[in-house]
From Swiss-Prot:
PROSITE patterns: WD_REPEATS_2 (PS50082), WD_REPEATS_REGION (PS50294). This is WD repeat-containing protein 35. It is found in: Cytoplasm, Cytoskeleton, Microtubule organizing center, Centrosome; Cytoplasm, Cytoskeleton, Cilium axoneme; Cytoplasm, Cytoskeleton, Cilium basal body. It holds the Pfam family Zf_2nd_IFT121. Expressed at high levels in testis and at lower levels in the brain (at protein level). Also present in other tissues, including heart, uterus, spinal cord, ovary, liver, kidney, lung, pancreas and stomach. Keywords: Cell projection, Cilium, Cilium biogenesis/degradation, Cytoplasm, Cytoskeleton, Repeat, WD repeat. As a component of the IFT complex A (IFT-A), a complex required for retrograde ciliary transport and entry into cilia of G protein-coupled receptors (GPCRs), it is involved in ciliogenesis and ciliary protein trafficking. May promote CASP3 activation and TNF-stimulated apoptosis. Transmembrane segments: none annotated. WD repeats lie at residues 12-51, 69-108, 113-152, 154-193, 491-528.
Length: 1170
């Protein structure tokens, strides 16, 4: 950070000033002094030149108003920026509030206690309240509209300072005896502040200043110290909050009169005076510190007595009240910034975020990329890359070097255990230094990594990509600098203060003035030089022969590293300090292509030096980005950071150096020959290129070729040779015009020469296909069909790249570009167009699979299958059907193309459905795919589960019927399959029998196929018996119930025999009833209590009725069972004795002939009765 005095304003009549305050928002400066002096000034920059911005622009007083109203010396002035009010107070205790009206300041309110003098006034952060403290201990808090909120008398206390906390909840009162008391915003005492900075201090002291930064522009770090308290003896403490037990302590070593934070709380200015041994009088100085107590520099100020200071709103200037003068100093902040490959990288803080906002602004395309980085320390750039040095974690002392590209993409983060206070970067290495040690890291960029290197990356440390050296060591460059962090913690008496590096040299500056030179990248100490200054910034020229040093006082000196000179003792030494010395320098940059050329910033002027001779200065306050090709690029960071979210290209400045300007003037005004001689005397590739271009314009091909040779431009030489082969002068002229980028003019010349082909060729080179198409169509001759097609396709690509698919389709149709057409139809969701395109393509066209995949992605199965089959990919077609759940189509395709995988696909999908408990979906899947046996198994399983739940019997019957129907379909399928195999050789009966035999072999594992209808029969009779019983057909109900004894494996025995006992009892067949009760009482599944209930019931029945059946003959035939059992009518449950009966074609069950006339559907399987 650098600072220098820039302006001085004298107060009339030599009236001594007492206080000064700069309005941060509007730029008004109020200063108060003796004899009631109160002035409001305003400095404004007035310039029409866009290059003169910021500090470089001349400033004039646009306001200089004397405010009348005070009679005594004005001692306190304070601004309310939110409400544009000025509050002042004099030695008589008179307080005046001033307001701005039509460009002038007027009294708004006056107040005078007539008891004591006002020592301090402070507005809170939002400008709503003011706190006024009087010397006699009186405190008044008032509102912005002049109303008193509360007042308090602190007895026996002399007050001298007051300040608000950021949230307006705390007030700090500074006492005349040096104590600071903490109060709440209602005036209640909380505690005394602990003042660590006054430990071991004796004698009387007073408070010089209290300033609490309110965080309005964000903080440089989370939990950053922001409350500064300083005493007249130079002791200072900076606290995070009012109760901070571990504040930052500073001993400024000066007599202090005032302190103030800058606008973002990153710099604390401490004003006062210091005794100098060589002089009798004290010297006025301003010291600058970071919130962490690091000293940034000292500004010496002329005059006898400094009394006050105030920062400008942007933090770029500071106003100092000295005697009867106001001095202004310009501040050149240490911005965190860098420049790499046309990109300006800069960081700033925001009040709404704890991190730094790092902006990568591509100045060429005017695009910006924003990254948020916690605890950013510095930004360093080189070539196309930059390094962000950050703190890894608040609680852990580890740091990170993040390698980024020019759009802010992190490429490689490197964690290190030393503080990267100083960072330098070359094209291959990053060097970071703490105060004691150096760390070097050979970084790799992804595009340069080979497969071998990627494999070896884990062992990279051993191969020397990272090394650490202590600053006191003498490395030899062989195997020194092993990766050992213990070196980094060893202290040193002479800390590092600056570093720089080039591809072959590393320079380290130390606080004593010693400069250490190392070879690089094999770090070996070559030389030590001793200088009389403490370096702040070091810079090597492009061939590493000369070192530029800017010291902490802003003095620029130069050191020749290799010159051998004889010193005063007659000894020959290496290295010489050059005579050139410049003061108030805050930035410098060597030219990348000339070791004797550099640019430097001195105050608000830029100087260019060639061989240590300066050119005339340029007025600017920009930071230098780049210096090459005799052009300097600089950036007005001050302006950018006023509105960092919207950087403007106006803030990038390009300056040509004198030799480039002179050469251009010579060529324009004198001629090529004289200019050629001048450039010969001052050679540079950029000047030769300038000459070559001028010679080309005049068609002086010899001079142009010579100049291109001198600037090593091979393309230029080839172009001149091509021009030499052309016969026509106008043709040469047109080519040169095209070379200089004046394409419209060149095209016009080609067309005037009737060379439409050359005009088309020019537009082809430029990729201007719209114009190519236009030229092709407007020509009188036949257009080249292939070129026309190419143009149509290129225009189609243009529209497609911009997602204008409709426009693209029109051109792709004309260009017959089926591939891109398919893509456009797909993006437009024009599936009809896509289908038509697929139909128009020949078989096995390479685009068909792609189109088919497009159909698959949108679930259009039929079209996808058609496309796959057209390109002879039946497997893909089947996969599509499976993917889109078209299993019947999948099976059909698999069969028609003799594919075997369908079974495994079905099984896989079915298991997936079963995992999700979608059993019915799995059944439907198998049924659609004609896998009836698997579907039946699942359906049977569902029926069994439902039966176990004892839910509605009708539902269970339906499920068993469905299962049985699926089995019947399976039987039919097997018979048909076998018929297909036997090609008419045997009879139908034989083939059907073979089918059944094959089926028997297949179904040995599952016996339920043999009597698939058992479940259905069981529940059919179960329901039928109950229906008959309820309808009063008790005998028929008993006959039906007797059948249920065969189905104990399906219906629980307790239900069967309970129903049988009920039916038998109802039809007075007590013998059957008795057997049913015996069976019930013997069931093991029943509890003792249930058995007892059955016994009691049986006792009740059989005490009244003998256990004998009345009608023997019919029951006996049912009870006998065995092989000779009669068929049963499923409509009535009765045995069929007649020879005439109906057989169901589906379930093969019987119904009495006289009964079937009552039914339209089979009573069991519900198939229609024919």
């Amino acid at each position: 950070m650098f600072f220098y005095l820039s302006k001085k304003i004298a107060v009339p009549n030599n009236v001594k000033l007492k206080c000064i305050s700069w309005n941060k928002d509007q730029g008004f400066i109020a200063c108060g002094g003796e004899d009631g002096l109160l002035k409001v000034l305003r400095l404004e920059t007035q310039t029409d030149d866009s290059k003169l911005r910021g500090l470089a622009a001349p400033s004039n007083l646009s306001m200089n108003q004397n405010l009348e109203g005070h009679s005594g010396a004005v001692q306190v002035v304070t601004w309310n920026e939110q409400y544009q009010k000025l509050t002042t107070s004099d030695q008589n205790g008179l307080i005046i509030v001033w307001m701005l009206y039509k460009g002038s300041w007027y009294e708004e309110m006056i107040n005078n206690r007539n008891k004591s003098v006002v020592r301090s006034m402070s507005w809170n952060a939002d400008g709503q309240k003011i706190c006024i403290v009087y010397e006699d201990g009186a405190v008044i808090v008032g509102s912005v509209d002049g109303n008193r909120i509360w007042g308090k008398d602190l007895k026996g206390i002399q007050l001298c300072h007051v300040t608000w906390s950021a949230d307006s909840k705390i007030l700090l009162f500074g006492m005349a005896n040096g104590e600071i008391h903490i109060y709440d915003n209602q005036g209640n005492f909380i505690m005394k502040m602990k003042l660590n900075c006054l430990v071991n201090v004796t004698g009387a002291i007073s408070i010089a200043g209290i300033h609490w930064y309110h965080g309005t522009e964000g903080y440089v770090e989370p939990d950053c110290p922001c409350l500064a308290i300083c005493f007249d003896n130079g002791r200072c403490q900076i606290m995070r909050h009012e109760n901070d037990q571990n504040p930052v302590l500073i001993d400024t070593g000066m007599y202090v009169v005032g302190i103030q934070w800058n606008h973002i709380g990153s710099v604390l200015a401490v004003a006062g005076s210091q005794k100098v041994v060589t002089q009798d009088k004290d010297v006025n100085i301003v010291q600058f510190y970071t919130p962490f107590g690091e000293h940034l520099g000292t500004l010496k100020v002329p005059g006898k007595q400094m009394c006050s200071l105030s920062w400008e709103g942007g933090g770029l200037k500071i106003a100092l009240a000295v005697d009867s003068f106001i001095y202004f100093a310009n501040i050149r902040p240490d911005y965190k910034w860098g420049y790499c490959s046309n990109t300006v990288v800069y960081a700033y803080t925001r009040p709404d975020r704890p991190e730094y906002c790092v902006v990568f602004w591509d100045t060429k395309n005017n695009e910006k990329y924003v990254k948020y980085v916690k605890s950013l320390i510095s930004i360093t750039t080189c070539g196309d890359f930059c390094i962000l040095a950050t703190k890894a974690d608040e609680n852990h002392p580890q740091f990170v070097l993040v390698l980024c590209n020019s759009i802010g993409t992190p490429l490689d983060p490197k964690y290190i255990d030393l503080v990267p206070l100083f960072v330098a970067m070359t094209k291959t290495h990053v060097i970071a230094a703490s105060k004691e040690a150096l760390y070097t890291w050979q970084y790799r960029v992804a595009k340069k990594l080979t497969a071998l290197e990627i494999n070896q990356i884990t062992r990279s440390r051993k191969e020397g990509r990272e090394r650490i050296y202590h600053v006191d060591d003498v490395p030899s460059g062989s195997v020194d600098g092993v990766f050992d962090y213990s070196k980094a913690i060893q202290g040193t008496r002479d800390p590092i203060c600056a570093i720089t590096a080039s591809d072959k040299t590393l320079i380290v500056g130390r606080e004593s003035g010693v400069i250490q030179r190392y070879s690089f990248p094999n770090v070996a100490l070559i030389q030590k030089y001793s200088l009389d200054c403490r370096a702040c910034q070091l810079s090597l020229n492009c061939n590493s022969s000369r070192l530029a040093i800017i010291d902490i006082a802003g003095v620029l000196t130069f050191f020749d590293l290799d010159t051998r000179v004889t010193d005063s003792t007659g000894q020959q030494v290496v290295g010489e300090l050059l005579k050139l010395e410049r003061k108030d320098v805050w930035d410098m940059k060597w030219a990348k292509d000339n070791p004797d050329l550099f640019a430097m910033m001195e105050k608000t002027r830029m100087y260019v030096f060639r061989n240590l001779d300066p050119e005339e200065p340029i007025q600017t306050s920009g930071y230098i980005c780049n210096f090459e090709d005799l052009e300097i690029k600089s950036v007005l960071l001050d302006e950018i950071l006023k509105n960092p979210e919207h950087p403007s290209k106006d803030y990038i400045m390009n300056f040509e150096i004198r030799s480039l300007r002179d050469s251009r003037a010579l060529i324009e005004k004198v001629g090529i020959e004289d200019a050629s001689q001048f450039i010969e005397d001052n050679p540079h590739p950029r000047l030769w290129r300038l000459l070559a271009e001028a010679a080309l314009q005049k068609l002086d091909l010899y001079t142009a070729q010579q100049a291109f040779v001198r600037c090593k431009d091979y393309q230029g030489i080839k172009f001149v040779k091509r021009l030499g082969n052309l016969q026509s002068e106008s043709m040469k002229q047109a080519e040169v015009i095209a070379y200089f980028g004046r394409f419209e003019e060149a095209e016009r010349m080609y067309l005037d020469m009737d060379r439409r082909d050359l005009a088309i060729g020019l537009r082809l080179k430029l990729g201007d296909w719209f114009r190519v198409l236009q030229l092709l169509k407007t020509g009188s001759g036949d257009a080249d069909d292939s070129l026309l097609e190419q143009a149509h396709n290129a225009i189609g690509d243009y529209f497609a790249d911009r997602q204008k698919w409709m426009n693209a389709v029109q051109y792709y149709v004309k260009g017959r570009n089926q591939e891109r057409l398919a893509e456009c139809y797909y993006m437009l969701e024009d599936y009809e167009g896509l289908e038509n395109l697929a139909n128009s393509l020949p078989e096995n066209h390479k685009l068909l699979p792609e189109i088919a995949q497009m159909f698959v992605r949108v679930g259009m199965c039929e079209q996808a299958v058609s496309a796959f089959l057209k390109c002879n990919q039946p497997k893909a077609a089947v996969d599509t059907c499976v993917h889109l759940n078209q299993w019947n189509k999948a099976v059909e395709l698999a069969k028609s193309h003799s594919m075997k995988e369908i079974g495994s696909l079905l099984a896989r999908y079915a298991s997936h459905l079963l995992e999700k408990n979608k059993t019915l979906d799995a059944i439907e899947l198998y049924r659609k795919a004609s896998y009836f046996f698997d579907a039946a198994k699942l359906m049977y399983k569902i029926a069994d589960e439902e039966a176990k739940k004892r839910t509605k019997p009708l539902r269970v019957k339906k499920l068993y019927v469905l299962s049985a129907l699926l089995i019947e379909q399976y039987h039919e399928q097997m018979k048909n399959a076998q018929r297909g195999k036997v090609k008419g050789k045997n009879s139908e009966a034989t083939s059907a029998l073979a089918g059944l035999l094959e089926e028997e072999v297949l179904s040995t594992t599952s016996r339920f196929t043999d009597n698939a209808w058992r479940g259905a029969e069981a529940y059919h009779f179960f329901i039928l018996a109950q229906r008959q019983l309820y309808e009063g057909y008790v005998d028929t109900a008993l006959k039906t119930a007797l059948h249920l004894r065969d189905y104990e494996d399906i219906i629980p025995s307790v239900e069967i025999y309970s129903l049988l006992a009920l039916c038998a009892c109802a039809s007075r067949a007590f013998g059957t009833c008795s057997k049913a009760f015996i069976k019930l009482e013997s069931l093991e599944t029943l509890s003792a209590e249930q058995k007892q209930q059955y016994e009691d019931l049986a006792l009740e029945i059989f005490t009244k009725h003998t256990p004998k059946d009345n009608r023997k003959s019919e029951l006996n035939s049912l009870l006998e069972g065995g092989e000779g059992k009669l068929p049963t009518c499923i409509a009535t449950g009765s045995p069929i004795i007649e020879y005439q009966f109906w057989v169901c074609k589906v379930c093969k069950h019987y119904v009495l002939a006289q009964e079937i006339s009552n039914y339209n559907f089979c009573p069991l399987c519900h198939s229609s009765v024919e």
